[in-house]
Each structure stands twice: as C-alpha cells, then as structure tokens.
Amino acid sequence: MFIIAPERTRELDRLQKYLDKLGQPYRVFVTNLETDLDQQTESLATFFTQKDPASKVGKPLFFNDLAVPELWECWTLGITTYLFDGEERRANVVLREDILSRTVDRVEWFGQGEEIVSIDVYNRYGWRSKRSLLTEAGQSYLDIYLNPQQEEVLLHFVSQGTFLLQTPKGRDRLYASKKELQRAVLEQVLPEDEAVLLMDKALLDVVKEIPKERLAYCASNAHDLDEIKEQVSQILLVEDGLLREKKDGITVLSGLVDVEQESFQPEALVMTASQEVEGLSSLVHQFPQVTFHIAALTAMGPKLTDLATRSNVRLYPGISLDKYEDLLSSCSIYLDCNQGEEVWSSSLHALENGQVLFGLKSKVHHEAYKDLSTITDSVEEMEQQLEIVLQQPEAYKELVREQARILKLPEKEALEELFKRLEGGTA
C-alpha cells in the first residue's frame, strides 16, 4: 500500500492503525516539506535529502553533543536551555517533546539583542535537516534543506514560492511552485504495482495514470464524494463512518476491532464535556476493583473533582490527545452516560479499541447503541451487567463480538479481501 497524504494528521494515524490491524504493509508519502519522519514515511524534502537508507538510522541529538565553537557552553535552567559564549547568550536550544531526554528539536540563533535570525531544525536521527533564515519580522524568507553530510540540497525561496534543487553534478533545477515540485516528485515515487490510498483530492489529477482498480480515496466523512467516486474504485471512511447507511463503493474502516487481540482489564474510561455523568459516583463506590479514568478537554466541575479522593479514580482535566490514545488502548470498559455532546467521537474510538460500552438508554450518543445488552434503562441494571463481566471475564470477548454484530462494525475478513483486490488491481 502506498499512502499519499498532504501532511501527518489524526486521520492518517487512524488509517495506519487500521492497516496495522489488518496486517497490511504500507509506505507513506506526505506532500509537504517535513524533515522529521519515521522510516516508513517520506516527504517532498526527504525525497531529495535522504536518498541513502543510512540517513534514517540514528537517534535524537543529546543537547550536550551540539557542535559549537570552543569554549562555548550549553546551559540549562529548568526546561530552558541555551548556548552561552562566556559573555552572552547566543541561541535558544528547544528540546524535543520528551523533555527529560534532553534531545534537540531546534536551535534558534540570535542576532543583535537576542533577536532570532535563523533556526536550525534537527530530526529524530540526530542531524540538522533544515535551516531557516528569518526576516526582521521573524518570518522565514529562505528554507534550506540539508542532507546528512550537511550539503544544501533543496532551497525554498518562501516569498517567491519557488524551489531550487542543487545536484552534485551541478545540474540545478528550478521549480516555479510547490505544486510543480509535488507533481515532479510524485511522478517518480508513484508505484507501478501497488495500491494507492489517496488522502488529498487536490492530487486526483496527478494520480490519474494509476489504474482506477488500484486507487482508493480516504475521507474523514461521507459528504460531497459523488465526483470522487467516479475516479476511484473505493472510498474508505477513516473517521466518521459508524452507523451510516451502506453505499456502493464506500467502505467504512472506523469501528474496526480485532477481537482476538483484545484482553479484559478492569479499567473504565469516560470522556465527558459535562460534570453530569449519571451513575458514575455509584459505580465508583460499587466497584472498587475497577479503576475509573475520567477525562475532559477542560477543567472539571465539583461533581467530578470530589471523586478524586477515591483510590480507584483517576482524573484527566485538559487531557492531551496522546494520553487519551493511551487510555483508549488500556481500558476495556467505556461509560456512555454523560450529558451533553460527545467528545472526539470517543464511543466509536472505544469500540475499535475493544472496549465494551456500558450506558443508559436515555444518555447514549448514538441511537443504535440502545440495542446493546449493556445499555440499560437504569443505573442498577447497568451495575448488574458490569458485575457479570467482572465475575466472568471470559464473557468480555463475546460482548465485543456482540457489539460488532449489532452495530454492523467493519469485518476484518471482508476488509482483508478488499485490500487484496486493491493490491491485485481487481477492486
């Protein structure tokens, strides 16, 4: 599978997870200029700067290993790190997301008065992959993309929108726009015998030479797809597809769960935009053996914060996306009994992570959930259903299968067959 995406997004992450569940190998090409990419992903910039597979071997650069002039030092104050020449600060060192690792994301070089005049970007393999020169207003006017030997390979003249490719043989080439650069690179990287999964409809004209039978378009929802359907063999819904009426040529990936890979853990998740979560306090007290993870995008009201004293409660106000993803993968129970709108399509994500939905018919966020045996009329009935699962963990997988059957979630075998046809050009 060859995935073409405009950038790394949540939808791309979800598509990759679905393909992983199906055991489908894939490569990713993002049509932007990122330089900090994993080994299976390439961009317009890395296509030119990382030709050698050895360029994708290494680890992030430790801040003390930065190459600086003699007698210069790297100083750290808390999470603030900078380069010091003995008299004054010469640069900020911005660390990667895992701050405790003390590895370098970028270096912001100062001119006069600590005004940032250029930025060096370091990738996950430990070498400088990009340098940006800035105007007095702090905007980049020239982006320079480097290879591991620190040779300038691709120059982006930002204000003009042009690109200059510098080759070792001196046969430099000018691209008048990013679109021209995209087209030139894609013509070289498009596979001859792989299925192509396109996530950017603006590039449909670029991939028109790909046989329709090997081309699929990945969408986040089912809106405004009629024109695209005529140009591809399949449309794959990766985000907003659960519970929709089935349509020819449109395949839902969202909700896919591999039941055999799941195992029961007495961990429950509720994602809420309101402090009104019916029955939550009773459940917390009734089931001390279950850890309840309560998450929200904002601060929490007292009805939730008052539960913090319970040993089996964990609160996550202002939860990050990464932590949310961690909880989805570690919990086996999802509570859909909160008032207000659903956050982040969390019940759907819970389903595809093998969580059993428990909730109240008066509160569930999708009408079809009311057909599930674990969605009840009262808190007392919900507690009885939860008690059964806790006493008989072997019932967990059967409940997950029941959910998939009643909600008509994607079937792994059917999707495996679909991708097999795409790869073979018979879809």
Q: For each of these PLM feature ranges, what is it?
A:
Residues 1-68:
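N-terminal subdomain of nucleotide-sugar transferases
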Residues 69-181:
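Repetitive, compositionally biased segments used for assembly/scaffolding
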Residues 168-267:
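Catalytic core of nucleotide-activated saccharide and alditol-phosphate transferases
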Residues 248-306:
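Conserved catalytic-core segment of nucleotide-activated headgroup transferases in glycan assembly
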Residues 298, 316-327:
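Conserved active-site histidine-acidic residue motif and adjacent donor-binding/catalytic loop
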Residues 302-319:
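Nucleotide-activated donor-binding/catalytic signature segment of Leloir-type glycosyltransferases, i.e.
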Residues 333-406:
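Catalytic binding pocket for nucleotide-activated donors in carbohydrate/polymer assembly enzymes
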Residues 405-427:
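C-terminal alpha-helical cap of glycosyltransferases
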